[in-house]
Amino acid sequence: MKKNKGLMKILTIISILLVSLVVFSGCGKEKKEKEDKSYLDPINSMMTALQNKDIDEYLKTIPAEYQEKMEENYSNYKSLLKTQILDRLYSSLESSYGKIQKISYEEIEKEKMSDEDLKEEEEDYKSLLGDKADENKTYVTDGYKVKIKVIATTEDNGDKDEEMTVYVYKVNGKWYISMNH
């Protein structure tokens, strides 16, 4: 009888370990299967910038090297970007749809950027870096053509939406909006 009790304890412990192993390995698998959506980060920043007319948020969508070049050429580049991009785009949306309360978006689909498009982004980036560019290094490592539906919630006309395509690329490990498209 004591042998059976000892065997039962061992079987119970083994069963608990097996159940724990299945549960914990299943949880880890679930995390791995979740798709990395970090390519949407610059689109999120763009929408937040547009909603709040926030130039600093918008600048998160542009690599620092582009910003440095803009600053070299235009001392007031931030105010230029704000008036020429954010304010104009916001005004255009308001003239089309009415007074805007909220701007959001939904991802419709994404398509991997072609090797040709990535090469073009890479060449532009290296050109921007000039003498600082390492010709043996690849800076642009990934990219997507993301089709989104921009939703403008207005005071008078409810939700209005429009589809658009945004090109995003990954440079030095961070996602940005393409300056070429």
Which residue stretches match the model-derived regions?
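Bacterial N-terminal signal peptides that target proteins for export
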Residues: 2-14
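C-terminal motif of bacterial Sec signal peptides marking the signal peptidase cleavage site
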Residues: 22-26
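Short, low-complexity N-terminal intrinsically disordered segments enriched in polar/charged residues
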Residues: 27-52, 60, 68
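Short solvent-exposed beta->alpha transition segments
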Residues: 59-137
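A short, structured loop/turn motif at beta-sheet edges
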Residues: 137-142, 169-172
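A short hydrophobic beta-strand element
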Residues: 140-152
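Short beta-strand edge/turn micro-motifs at domain boundaries
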Residues: 157-181
